[in-house]
Design a protein with these regions (language model features):
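Active-site HxH/HxHxD metal-binding segment of metal-dependent hydrolases
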Residues: 66-132, 221-230
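A short, polar/proline- and glycine-enriched secondary-structure boundary/capping micro-motif
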Residues: 50, 71-75, 167-172
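Structural signal for conserved beta-strand scaffold positions within catalytic alpha/beta enzyme cores
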Residues: 38, 86, 108, 122-123, ...
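Conserved beta-strand hairpin/beta-sheet module of binuclear metal-dependent hydrolase folds
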Residues: 23-72, 148-162
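Short, flexible loop segments at the rims of nucleotide/cofactor-binding pockets, characterized by
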Residues: 37-42, 60-65, 82-86, 134-138, ...
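Metallo-beta-lactamase
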Residues: 2-21, 28, 59-61, 134-137, ...
Length: 236
């Protein structure tokens, strides 16, 4: 059963302005696939993109969107949030406020659960079955980096920062100054290739760099693109 939202008065009011200029309108989430919405990049998570899967009985939030009136009202209008999966330690901004407002259950890989003290958190070790599919531990970007596999629409992988589009719009693991363990990240990519097939993985929704997708909002032919990666060259 989905948790009820608190009363309307719990919403964070928009900030007042002493100037005569009207504040710029905040962009609402946009539909990218059938029942999947992408939120605008969140400055508090260094430009991370959060997603909402809207189901009949369960709404599933992947990573934390910017917490403002526009996004809160959008979630209310869609029926609330039952689960929030945090795919890595850099995607948890405002997790407390989101849980307090929506009553959602938070899922996170167990190595990073300690970063959310005082919250109702379910940690998992390798995989955890959810109402929308399977959360999969994919260490490398961070110790507890994970992805969500949504077993609908031909298979959709929400990859967090484990797999991202590069400036050419091509999907790849990207090594950054924040990468925890590059070799483990490469191994985790290989584990996804071994786990899926062209018929079970059609799309990937990355957790950042979505501007490089040139408005598409997702990566199609997902398994084909994964299998074509030269992981040996990237590992060297």
């Amino acid at each position: 059963m989905q948790p009820d939202f608190p009363q309307q008065g719990k919403l964070i009011p928009p900030q007042s302005s002493s100037s005569n200029q009207r504040p710029a309108a905040l962009k609402p989430p946009r539909l990218v696939l059938d029942n999947i919405f992408a939120f605008p990049p969140n400055r508090e998570t260094l430009g991370g993109t959060a997603y909402l899967i809207v189901e009949n009985a369960v709404n599933f939030l992947i990573d934390c969107p910017a917490w403002n009136v526009t996004n809160e009202q959008f979630l209310r209008d869609k029926g609330g949030v039952s689960f929030l999966l945090i795919t890595h330690r850099g995607a948890m901004a405002r997790a407390r406020e989101i849980q307090e407002t929506t009553g959602c259950q938070i899922l996170i890989q167990e190595q990073e659960a300690y970063l959310l003290p005082g919250l109702d958190v379910t940690g998992f070790q390798y995989d955890i079955l959810t109402p929308c599919g399977v959360a999969i531990w994919t260490p490398g970007h961070s110790p507890g980096s994970s992805c969500l596999y949504y077993n609908s629409l031909g298979g959709v992988l929400f990859s967090g920062r484990h797999l991202l589009p590069n400036p050419q719009g091509e999907l790849a693991p990207l090594r950054t100054s924040k990468t925890f363990h590059w070799q483990r990240q490469i191994q985790s990519v290989q584990s996804l290739i071994d786990r899926f097939t062209p018929t079970t993985l059609q799309f990937i929704c990355p957790g950042a760099n979505t501007g490089f997708l040139r408005g598409r909002g997702f990566v199609d032919r997902a398994y084909e693109r994964l299998a074509a990666l030269d992981l040996k060259a990237q590992a060297s």
